[in-house]
Amino acid sequence: MEKPIIEFRNVSKKFGNKLPINNVSFTVKKNNITTLIGPNGAGKTTIVRLMLGLEKPTNGEIIIDPKLKIGYVPQKFGLTPDLPITVKKFLDLLAPSNFNSNIKEINSFIDLEHIKDQEISKLSGGQFQKVVLACSIVNKPDLIILDEPLQSLDVTSQQEFYQLINLIRKKLNITVFMISHDLFTVIKNSDQVICLNGHICCSGVPNEITPNSEFSNALSSLGFYTHHHDHRH
């Protein structure tokens, strides 16, 4: 069996008297799409900060290759709506040394050519998300972490986004770790789903989320109403 790209072993993190995550264990498999879901305050942000090395666990162990290259797209990406800079210039600022060679490969499946000269402020939600994806992979990471990437997208744009994610992981052999509240989309498009509420409530593959299953009941108890959907192909 191939070694997981990240492994949490009985990890707890304490901030003062608060314990946002307690005894959390899970693995992220290479080249999979793993999605972490949970209510507000469940500890999802703490998990990401631990993955990025911004926090250290109070207890437990996180096994991660120190050479692992990670691309991260936070929930609030930090671009102002009136940013007077073109898409090409923005990406060039991110990775000037290898932009030209890498962006050609990225452009072959993200298709930024027709928007490269547009200002960031003029982009639609779907177009902006393409730029965000390009930002996360322009330096060819082993893993990308996406925090709530679907929030401002309509249903059509969400599906286009997942199609791009699948192309990215297949063409560049990238592992994807995502945080989302959209259970329906998660079920259709993830290889593994982890439900967090301070601890791991349930985890598994989407086809295990069947009516009255332990997985489904755990999700329902947190306000995620489930019914069976076919796993993505």
Swiss-Prot record:
Keyword Metal-binding: no
Protein name: Zinc import ATP-binding protein ZnuC
Binding site for ATP: G38, P39, N40, G41, A42, G43, K44, T45
Entries under InterPro entries matching the protein: AAA+_ATPase, ABC_transporter-like_ATP-bd, ABC_transporter-like_CS, Metal_Ion_Import_ABC, P-loop_NTPase
Assigned keywords, A-Z: ATP-binding, Cell inner membrane, Cell membrane, Ion transport, Membrane, Nucleotide-binding, Translocase, Transport, Zinc, Zinc transport
Function: Part of the ABC transporter complex ZnuABC involved in zinc import. Responsible for energy coupling to the transport system.
One of the Pfam families matching this protein, by short name: ABC_tran
Catalytic activity: Zn(2+)(out) + ATP(in) + H2O(in) = Zn(2+)(in) + ADP(in) + phosphate(in) + H(+)(in)
Chief location category: membrane
One Gene Ontology term from the biological process aspect of the record: response to zinc ion
Superkingdom, natural source: Bacteria
Gene3D superfamilies: P-loop containing nucleotide triphosphate hydrolases
